[in-house]
């Protein structure tokens, strides 16, 4: 009987003329309910058992000075409460954003300026989306806070990622051949989209619907259809991009949760379940990333098949399916450096150290010796890799200090490199008051917009610099702390009290285009990433390191 039922369901699926749903968008003709039932009824995803083995920690001498600071767990309960409050009632995954009901009409109208189609997509993402980077920040905050309830919540995203589906979205893992994402052109099947091929699956899509919806409704006016919407007029989830940087943070979060759960600091070992979800997921995503590692040592932004609408000037060098594959992001690689470091520290496997050395090689390639800063990235053109000079990226500079540490930067690029890097970054993106006090930093070459999240990353960098210079240059240490203090005070301009028990921080100080493919939001749009990073700053917790 089961075989007959299976055949009937397969006929139904074929009759529905399923398109390639994993290019830019999907279509409402696809029936995710049928496919979910079919996939999991006949081939459920196994979860690891709970037997334990000891695993010694690999001694990694990358950070002679130790953690940023003693973790003081100075977590504002209003912020932590908000993180745990702003979750889907259906899946219990966190939302990336929050907008108070009174602010929604104006905020949503501003998004309409991009056109009804793009406005609808942006509103849907803001209303019910979860960027997996934001989800990682949520996981790390909860693991840092500790306690069984928080650890259970922190573990939940990894359970979904390992399962490979969320609600009606039957597959959140990008590979081949169910969808046509190719990591290795010589062996497309090397990274799979078959969610039953554990350990061989591809990246997670960067933004997923936290409610698990495939079909969506425009939150501004309740519309369910728009003429000309991609693939089908019926509104549906459209963001299917498996981007390297977001997946690095999925690994970082998994390793932070794993470290919190299983590390015995007294014995210096991990007492872990055989094949814990966190470690298995981290290994699997790292495998896909290493396959994307180019001859420069840098990890490509995404596999072949990741869609991008091209600008006119890009059409001669790229097509819609290879733009992401032929670009490398320095920010993405800094994140992967931290992810590989954590995996090497825990497992001691040399392949992760080798991957780190590759990224180190890439970072030397994109170091602008003249300005003493990192280029945003690189791209493949005319048979060779070329550095991307078009746009300055503030987060690359701050995160390099956070992740690599001032001591390593000085060792790699010369004495004083870390300090000069910060001074240059502040010159490009600092926002100042009339007295010259530093209010925050923006995204690129600008002095009139503050990113709360990127400012928090800069404050973390200043903490690292102050500690590094404390015993060798007290003047630099004082300057770093002064900049940090000035920015921290300024951040309260974008701190919103939602209720007596809930508070959160804005995404940014104003709406505007960011030259890296997205928009900053009105200050009324509260952000999981901003709020989480402010918690990191106040707690003295650097998420790039296992502490």
Can you say where each PLM-predicted feature lies in the sequence?
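Extracytoplasmic Gram-positive cell-surface binding/anchoring modules and repeats
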Residues: 127-128
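Extended ligand-binding clefts on enzyme/binding-domain cores
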Residues: 37-118, 132-133, 149, 156, ...
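Non-membrane alpha-helical segments in proteins
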Residues: 134-144, 249-253
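C-terminal segment of classical bacterial N-terminal signal peptides
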Residues: 14-21
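Sec-dependent signal peptide recognition
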Residues: 2-7
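Cysteine-centered motifs
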Residues: 10-12
């Amino acid at each position: 009987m089961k075989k007959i039922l299976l055949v009937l369901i397969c006929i139904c699926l074929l009759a529905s003329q399923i398109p390639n749903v994993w290019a830019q968008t999907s279509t409402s003709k696809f029936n995710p309910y049928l496919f979910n039932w079919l996939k999991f009824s006949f081939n459920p995803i196994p979860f690891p058992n709970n037997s334990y083995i000891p695993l010694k920690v690999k001694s990694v001498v990358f950070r002679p000075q130790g953690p940023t600071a003693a973790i003081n767990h100075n977590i504002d309960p209003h912020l932590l409460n908000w993180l745990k409050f702003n979750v889907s009632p259906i899946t219990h995954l966190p939302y990336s954003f929050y907008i108070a009901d009174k602010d929604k009409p104006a905020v949503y109208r501003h998004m309409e300026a991009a056109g009804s189609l793009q406005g609808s997509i942006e509103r849907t993402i803001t209303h019910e989306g979860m960027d997996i980077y934001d989800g990682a920040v949520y996981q790390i905050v909860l693991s840092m806070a500790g306690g069984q309830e928080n650890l259970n919540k922190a573990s939940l995203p990894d359970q979904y990622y390992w399962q490979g589906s969320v609600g009606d979205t039957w597959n959140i893992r990008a590979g081949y051949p169910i969808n046509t994402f190719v990591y290795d052109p010589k062996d497309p099947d090397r990274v799979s989209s078959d969610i039953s091929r554990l350990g061989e699956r591809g990246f997670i899509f960067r933004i997923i619907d936290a409610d698990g919806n495939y079909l969506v409704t425009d939150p501004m006016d309740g519309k369910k259809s728009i003429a000309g919407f991609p693939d089908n007029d019926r509104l549906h989830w459209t963001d299917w991009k498996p981007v390297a940087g977001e997946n690095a943070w999925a690994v970082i979060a998994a390793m932070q949760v794993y470290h919190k759960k299983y590390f015995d600091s007294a014995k210096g070992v991990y007492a872990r379940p055989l094949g814990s979800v966190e470690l298995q997921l981290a290994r699997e995503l790292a495998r896909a990333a290493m396959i994307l590692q180019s001859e420069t040592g840098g990890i490509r932004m995404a596999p072949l098949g990741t869609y991008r609408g091209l600008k006119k000037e890009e059409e001669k060098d790229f097509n819609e399916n290879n733009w992401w594959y032929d670009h490398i992001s320095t920010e993405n690689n800094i994140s992967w450096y931290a992810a590989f470091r954590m995996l090497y520290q825990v497992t001691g496997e040399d392949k992760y150290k080798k991957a780190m050395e590759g990224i180190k090689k890439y970072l030397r390639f994109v170091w602008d010796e003249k300005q003493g800063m990192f280029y945003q990235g690189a791209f493949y053109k005319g048979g060779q890799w070329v550095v991307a000079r078009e746009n300055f990226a503030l987060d690359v500079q701050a995160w390099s200090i956070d992740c690599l540490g001032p001591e390593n930067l000085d060792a790699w690029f010369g004495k004083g490199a870390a300090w000069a890097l910060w001074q240059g970054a502040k010159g490009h993106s600092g926002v100042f008051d009339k007295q010259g006090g530093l209010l925050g930093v923006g995204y690129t070459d600008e002095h009139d917009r503050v990113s709360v999240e990127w400012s928090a990353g800069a404050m973390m960098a200043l903490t690292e610099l102050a500690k590094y210079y404390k015993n060798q240059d007290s003047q630099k240490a004082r300057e770093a702390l002064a900049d940090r203090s000035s920015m921290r005070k300024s951040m309260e301009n974008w701190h919103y009290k939602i209720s007596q028990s809930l508070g959160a921080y804005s995404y940014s100080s104003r709406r505007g285009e960011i030259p890296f493919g997205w928009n900053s939001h009105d200050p009324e749009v509260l952000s999981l990433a901003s709020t989480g990073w402010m918690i990191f700053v106040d707690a003295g917790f650097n998420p790039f390191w296992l502490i």
